[in-house]
Amino acid sequence: MKTKAAVRNMRLEDIDHVYEIEASSFTSPWTKDSFYHELLENPYAHYLVIEKDGHLAGYCGIWIVMDDAQITNIAIKPEYRGQSLGETLFRSAVELCKEKDARRLSLEVRVSNHPAQGLYKKFGMQPGGIRKNYYTDNGEDALIMWVTINE
């Protein structure tokens, strides 16, 4: 039986699980303290999580400043990848940005991360530039992608 995934706002009690996903997804993961800071002290930060079968399967962070939104991080737990959960989560993030009256949405993605770029292109995101040597673990460039979401 296929169960539906549910997206909700991230809570403090989710941080341990979110950190596990972060650490398994990125070579230079954010710290747990960074997530606490985001939820408790950053007025621009909005975090969503996606659950499947009662388990936290992924998360997405967004900063919304005036009419500009930026995805700070998005990740799906390795064992849940390939189930369209990233697409569901990203769609929810875009909807949140629209609700908050953001006009533009941007993000950075590794130039080598073609699967993620493909997902973002499904939502109309287009390449907008390169940040040279953006990633500190290996000096890889970041591709800046953006889309207008509210006109």
UniProtKB/Swiss-Prot annotation:
Protein name according to UniProt: Putative [ribosomal protein bS18]-alanine N-acetyltransferase
N-acetyltransferase domain mapped to chain residues: 5-150
GO molecular function: protein-N-terminal-alanine acetyltransferase activity
Keywords recorded for this protein, A-Z: Acyltransferase, Cytoplasm, Transferase
Active site: 108, 120
Classification via PANTHER family: ACETYLTRANSFERASE (PTHR43420), ACETYLTRANSFERASE YPEA (PTHR43420:SF44)
Domain of life: Bacteria
Residues binding acetyl-CoA: 74-76, 113
Family per record: Belongs to the acetyltransferase family. RimI subfamily.
EC numbers, comma separated: 2.3.1.266
Function: Acetylates the N-terminal alanine of ribosomal protein bS18.
Location(s), subcellular: Cytoplasm
Substrates-to-products reaction catalysed: N-terminal L-alanyl-[ribosomal protein bS18] + acetyl-CoA = N-terminal N(alpha)-acetyl-L-alanyl-[ribosomal protein bS18] + CoA + H(+)
InterPro entries the record matches: AcTrfase_RimI/Ard1 (IPR006464), Acyl_CoA_acyltransferase (IPR016181), GNAT_dom (IPR000182), YpeA/RimI_acetyltransf (IPR050680)
Enzyme class of the recorded protein, top EC level: transferase
GO annotation, cellular component aspect: cytoplasm
